[in-house]
Each structure stands twice: as structure tokens, then as C-alpha cells.
Amino acid sequence: MTKEFHHITVLLHETVDMLDIKPDGIYVDATLGGAGHSSYLLSKLNDNGHLYCFDQDQKAIDNAQVFLKSYVDRGMVTFIKANFRHLKSELNALGVTEIDGILYDLGVSSPQLDERERGFSYKQDAPLDMRMDSDAALTAYHVVNDYPFQDLVRIFFKYGEDKFSKQIARKIEQARAIKPIETTAELAEIIKSAKPAKELKKKGHPAKQIFQAIRIEVNDELGAADESIQEAMTMLALNGRISVITFHSLEDRLTKQLFKEASTVDVPKGIPFIPEDMQPKFELVTRKPILPSQEELLANNRAHSAKLRVARKVRM
């Protein structure tokens, strides 16, 4: 891993081991990032196995080309620069119609957070950006300066779950009427000014939830995850598995709901047994989410909110 792309992988062994890797299987890392999961997964494959890696960030792919060079040279890995919401079409274009397993590590990678100019963090001043794909049109600047008041309130409530969403949206509206809000530091100060003093004394940065909400809006993170996970589940082979790491309640709720829908069936009253064609296609490998160990939490502070859920395809 290059110094420019340093990333500590969360729930490394649990996420990959839960896929029950077949050495000659076809696998997908839907969120390449720092390539930690990819590296460990590739170590379990033989030369007949293959891993397809998705990332919107060209820097992540460039880093992985170097970090995974030995596997690249053996023709065991293919990199795809695309949003994982296009999973099925991108894989189909490469002749892949069925996969043995897939993993997702949702959220922002550490290098994106740490790279000041990407504008993800409220901890350092930078232009408002927050794009995971630097070629995308919509930026945080556009959301903050151009979205109507009601749209700001909606995304702050929906994606940030911040009870002061209206007050924050009003402060933003007032500030941008004077001059555009251009940097993360400016926005963080406006958010702080909208919250009562007792809120500012609470643990955690007062801007965290609003920054999360804007980031989710800019990248349509939940919409993309919903589409991609559903596509992945249709592409899994029999006994294929899907591992999903989430970092906040919205992602976890979405994953839990998708897995529940795929692993349960509503039986109409009066039917004594469930016909085979109505049986659920998936079963939960994890009834409750797997959490990082105490050792991992001590080594990596960013692992604190991580949850891993896994499901297995039991019927086609």
C-alpha cells in the first residue's frame, strides 16, 4: 500500500472468511479502497480464481495496481473504475454472469477522509467537495449553496438524523445570502452556531451528522448501495455469500432490511406448507451483526461504528 493511500482495513478476516472462499471461485470486492480486503481474499485463491474490484476513485485503483502487483501479474484481478451501482452491467460486459461471493465496505475510505482537498472532513479546512468520484458533477458546494431550504432540511433529517436540521438549514440560508459558503471550516462554524450551547458540550463534533448527510446526498450512497446489493444477490451462485460492512445506522438498516426480505417469506393464511417456488432464496449467516474485537478497536479508532452482516444464497 502506498504512503499516499494508507488505509487500515476494518474487520479484515471476518469479512473475507465469512465468504467461505473457494480457491477457484469468482469474487467481487465492490469497494476496493485501500485493497486490504482484496489482498487477503486473493491470498485464498489459486490461479484459476479471479477477483473483480470496483472503485470510483482512480487513485485507489492506481494504488492497488502497485499493492496487488503479484496478483495482477498472474492475471488474477481486474479493476473496474465505476460506481458499484453498475455492478451487473459492468460484470456482464466482461462476460461474468455469476459470482461466488462479494464484499462491501461501505462509507468513505481513510485516504479520502485524510486528503484535505477532497473536502470530506470537518477537522481540516478545504473547499467543499465530498465527491468519491472526482469526475462527478454534483459537489458539496452545490448542495450547500444552491439547494432550497426545504431540500436542505430534508437531507439533514433523512441522512443526518440531526434534530436541529431546520435551524442549521436556516443558518446556511442566511449565510449564503451574504456570500457563498466555500470551505468545510466555514460550514462547520455555521453548523455550530445553529446549535444550543448544551449540544456543543456533547461528545463528538457538532458538524458530524450534517457532513454525513451532505456526503450521502452528493454521492447518492444509499441509493447506490440499495441497487448494488440487490443486483449482487441476483448474481450470486448457489451457496454464494455476500458480506456487507456498514458504518452508520442508515446503511445498516438498509442492509438488514434487504437481507430480511431475501431470507423470509410471508405465508398466506390457510396454506399448510410453503411451496418450493415461494421458499426464500437466502439465509442469514449472521443473525446479529459481527462487531470489531476489542483489539481492533484499540488499533483503529475508525472501526468503532463498523457492523458486518453476511447472507448465503440457498436457492436459485
Swiss-Prot record:
Coarse class of the protein's main subcellular location: cytoplasm
Gene Ontology CC: one annotated term: cytoplasm
Keywords, alphabetical: Cytoplasm, Methyltransferase, rRNA processing, S-adenosyl-L-methionine, Transferase
Class of enzymatic activity (EC top level): transferase
Subcellular localization, as worded in the UniProt entry: Cytoplasm
Residues the record lists as binding S-adenosyl-L-methionine: 35-37, 55, 84, 105, 112
Gene Ontology MF annotations: rRNA (cytosine-N4-)-methyltransferase activity
Enzyme nomenclature, EC number: 2.1.1.199
Tree of life domain: Bacteria
Single biological process term from Gene Ontology: rRNA base methylation
Pfam families per UniProt: Methyltransf_5
Reactions catalysed, as given in the entry: cytidine(1402) in 16S rRNA + S-adenosyl-L-methionine = N(4)-methylcytidine(1402) in 16S rRNA + S-adenosyl-L-homocysteine + H(+)
HAMAP family documented for this protein: 16SrRNA_methyltr_H
Chain's role: Specifically methylates the N4 position of cytidine in position 1402 (C1402) of 16S rRNA.
Family that this chain belongs to: Belongs to the methyltransferase superfamily. RsmH family.
Protein name listed in UniProt: Ribosomal RNA small subunit methyltransferase H
Species for this entry: Streptococcus uberis (strain ATCC BAA-854 / 0140J)
